[in-house]
Amino acid sequence: MNTNTYAIIQMGGQQLQVQTGRFYDTCDFSILKPDTKIIIYKVTMIHLNSQLVIGKPWLHNAMIKGRILHSYRDNKVTIYRMHSKKKMRRKQGHRQNITRFIVDGIFLDGKNI
């Protein structure tokens, strides 16, 4: 694996810059069990050595292989609404479900790069 090699993918409504061997957090895929293998086809760009391969909008000959590590819940965020000079106060909490996955390989034209 070259340390200069990375890809930009779209997953879970967000774009992520991914490298082989690193793990990333994305939106909830709790229906997938740990150690489930995943393939991501929505690859926007690949940086290989000193050249860029850019898709319009996706690279049709590229894919990312990875696996699910685990799912968990993020830290609680407290939302507090208050209208001044009124007796309106509302306190609410929210915890986002998150899935952590690891990238096993970046493939371009069927070859692991």
Swiss-Prot record:
Which coarse location class applies to the principal site listed for this UniProt protein?
plastid
Gene Ontology CC terms = chloroplast; ribonucleoprotein complex; ribosome
GO MF annotation, one: rRNA binding
Record's keyword terms, sorted: Chloroplast, Plastid, Ribonucleoprotein, Ribosomal protein, RNA-binding, rRNA-binding
From the Swiss-Prot or TrEMBL record, state where the protein is found: Plastid, Chloroplast
BP GO terms, sorted: translation
Its function, per the record, reads: This protein binds to 23S rRNA.
Subunit-structure text: Part of the 50S ribosomal subunit.
Indicate the family of this protein: Belongs to the bacterial ribosomal protein bL21 family.
| Name of the molecule in the record | Large ribosomal subunit protein bL21c
This protein's species is Chara vulgaris (Common stonewort)
Q: Which gene encodes it?
A: rpl21
